[in-house]
């Protein structure tokens, strides 16, 4: 019986050792560091200047939508690049699979576009105002 690890076994051992190394460093640092919080340490630091306002700033949700779309297409490139390097060996069926993969992502982009998530300046909705009722008793009578 062969005692060596398979190709995936090497990857799993490397991954496990990486996780143990990072977790060990994190736990060691957490146990050795002093933890004495005070208001001065918890305050916002702005290069020696007095802090103006809060450090908590609300970001517009559109930034996150654009970042999410970028990440989706960035991951698409990560998946398609290895496919492109071995395209001749995989044949036409792999081309069809890659086109379906890209098509699904393009459909998602088209959906976001139609929904208006890619519009940076959105039009304000035109909400009709309700007509005002004449002043009188609550039951509507004027007498």
Swiss-Prot record:
Q: Which of UniProt's keywords are assigned here?
A: Cell inner membrane, Cell membrane, Membrane, NAD, Quinone, Translocase, Transmembrane, Transmembrane helix, Transport
Q: What is its main location?
A: membrane
Domain of life the protein comes from: Bacteria
Gene Ontology annotations for the cellular component aspect, listed alphabetically: NADH dehydrogenase complex; plasma membrane
This molecule's function is given as: NDH-1 shuttles electrons from NADH, via FMN and iron-sulfur (Fe-S) centers, to quinones in the respiratory chain. The immediate electron acceptor for the enzyme in this species is believed to be a menaquinone. Couples the redox reaction to proton translocation (for every two electrons transferred, four hydrogen ions are translocated across the cytoplasmic membrane), and thus conserves the redox energy in a proton gradient.
The subunit structure is:
NDH-1 is composed of 14 different subunits. Subunits NuoA, H, J, K, L, M, N constitute the membrane sector of the complex.
Protein known as: NADH-quinone oxidoreductase subunit A
């Amino acid at each position: 019986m062969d005692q060596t690890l398979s190709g995936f076994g090497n990857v799993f051992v490397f991954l496990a050792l990486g996780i143990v190394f990072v977790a060990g460093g994190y736990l060691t640092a957490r146990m050795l560091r002093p933890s004495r919080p005070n208001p001065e340490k918890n305050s916002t630091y702005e290069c020696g200047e007095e802090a103006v306002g809060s450090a908590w700033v609300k970001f517009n949700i559109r930034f996150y939508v654009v970042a999410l779309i970028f990440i989706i297409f960035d991951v698409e490139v990560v998946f398609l690049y290895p496919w492109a390097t071995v395209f001749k060996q995989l044949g036409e069926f792999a081309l069809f699979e890659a086109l379906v993969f890209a098509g699904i992502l393009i459909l998602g982009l088209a959906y976001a576009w139609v929904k208006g998530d890619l519009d940076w300046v959105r039009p304000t909705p035109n909400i009709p105002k309700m007509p005002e009722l004449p002043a009188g008793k609550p039951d509507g009578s004027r007498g």
